[in-house]
């Protein structure tokens, strides 16, 4: 769930629709919390590795806000989230709160990577077969490299999508999705299970 959606008046309705989608893990973007990290780095000059850890905590802050706002469950770190998924019979969405102290993220620690690639990493980590990117802008193309150039996804994402080629990827402009639940359920249709990232579906 893109961080820029934090400023969207559609966010409450978006969360309401997500609540009806079973077996859903929500990966929050950094939103305004990550913007604060960028400003702090510019003012104080700390390195990108520190900024990366702080940006992960910014994602966790936005995620905690979403969980509180929508009444969703939340889990700190990928390991706890995976354990919660394994033991829980509940179908309500679960929000991942990234934890730089425990998440062994096999990714570059820089601003070149955002919640997009982290969501793809988590999908691989928990054995998910589909990833849906909820954005606050139109998705003009299905080409991941073009989306990265347009800064709709981060610049690491196209390469990661090739690495995790078994995970189907969809992109939705959530600000104009009047029937988001139906569109999400369409993403999870069995007939689309083998869609490859290079054939990203756009809604």
Language model features with spans:
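Nucleotide/pyrophosphate-binding catalytic subdomain
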Residues: 1-188, 196-203
